[in-house]
Amino acid sequence: MATSPCKTGLVACLLYAQIALAAGPLPIHWRSVNAEALRHLTALLRIDTSNPPGNETEAAQYLADVLQREGIPAKLLSLDPARANLVARIKGNGSARPIAILAHTDVVPAQRSKWSVDPFAAVRRHGHIYGRGALDDKEIVTAGLMVMLLLERRHIPLTRDVIFVAEAGEEGTPGVGINFLIGRHWDEIAAEYALAEGGSAVAQGGKVSYVAITTAEKVPRGVRLIARGPSGHGSRPSPNNAVLRLAAAVAKLGEWRTPMRLNDTTREYFERLASISSPDDADRYLHAGDPARAPEIDRYFERYEPAHYAMVRTTLAPTMLKAGIAFNVIPSEAEASIDIRALPDEDMPRFYAEMRVLIDDPNVEIEPRKPDRPATPPSSTDTAMFRALEHAQRRMFPQAVTLPSMLTGATDMAQLRAKGVQAYGFGPIVEAGDRGEAHANDERLAEASLYKLVEFLWYTILEVQR
């Protein structure tokens, strides 16, 4: 039987310990890490944090309990006792500024009758875990939690503090979440870099072809259309019917082809994407900014690549209609909500003026919504953090390429960028064409994708500490 060197004397024992430390931490046993990550994601998905009303405190307390058991200090900060944010920090040596891992614990509501499973039961099926929040954003919450646990357990020497922020209210109520944290607790979350949701590793046939890291995002700038006309009996139709006026206005906006325009982020995105694309696709991507080719390429995007069509323009989408009190009463007002996702540099007063000219009806009012996120410049690709993300991609997916991209949706990185933080969106592996997407019915995440997400974040955080 082998004998421990510590049994042969104190000097040998100390020498053995020094050799072990010099060799660095033992390799991570990823199978056990994966099992733990799945256990935490399952628990989080079973906590109903639908916003409204939110009730994020239960999820925040779960995270705090896990972290504190490992000796990691964690705080719950809240404007509303039911809607707490969690902030935890592992300190570095202070030679470089902190990193924040940001994720939100609230989720959008789920229409249970449209799901094939209970959206809050964390059902596992065919290698996937189903649940509201599986892709937005409890998988990032889980990855952030696991990285904090690994850093603490393995006693990793850090040059930067690592801050884990599990925030409330991202899905439409930032006043209790990121805005509250920035306004009242900025010293708790201030960082040079932030990592959050928004990106993805896109695979075809199980092989990752590119890792999209969001360095910019479009800006939510919705409006309400209010059409007015005389009320009356449904048996006496009128061409001035408010519903008809509204329908005509919405139809005109639906047919409006707003201009295609590239910025620094989308230009670099298409250049890098061309390097891994077929010759025909590469030709389109490399000439997307060419005025002579733009109309032809734009039509192709509209028909075959709707994500790219949306990425290169300010978009409008009618999302809600409201009119009438009874089927036989012509209403005096009719309303439509239009979701506008603007390019970061869009001149919104001019854009609204163009909408008025297009609608061409003085009886239809355009009422802009109060903005809840600022328009901000893109984060740089020439930073230690972006290089760390590229390093993690090369280590895990050497056949792929990292693409700086512009998110067509919106995240709370906008508020961080407005404070001068270089913020980047990352995300799990998604199979091209998979419809189990965020906010969809039967939202789901491949379990293997969760495991790779944790690993990707781990290697990124280690690399940026160098």
Positions of predicted regions on the chain:
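Solvent-exposed, acidic/flexible segments
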Residues: 30-38, 52-60, 81, 134-137, ...
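Hydrophobic, small-residue-rich alpha-helical packing segments that form membrane-like cores
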Residues: 140, 166-221
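N-terminal hydrophobic or amphipathic helices/low-complexity stretches enriched
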Residues: 22-54, 68, 73, 113-114, ...
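Active-site metal-coordination/substrate-binding segment of hydrolases
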Residues: 96-163
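Hydrophobic h-region of N-terminal signal peptides that target proteins for export
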Residues: 13-23
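Metal-dependent amide/peptide-bond hydrolase catalytic core
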Residues: 23-25, 74, 199-209, 213-216, ...
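A non-catalytic alpha/beta surface segment that caps or lines the substrate-entry region
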Residues: 40, 50-100, 119-123
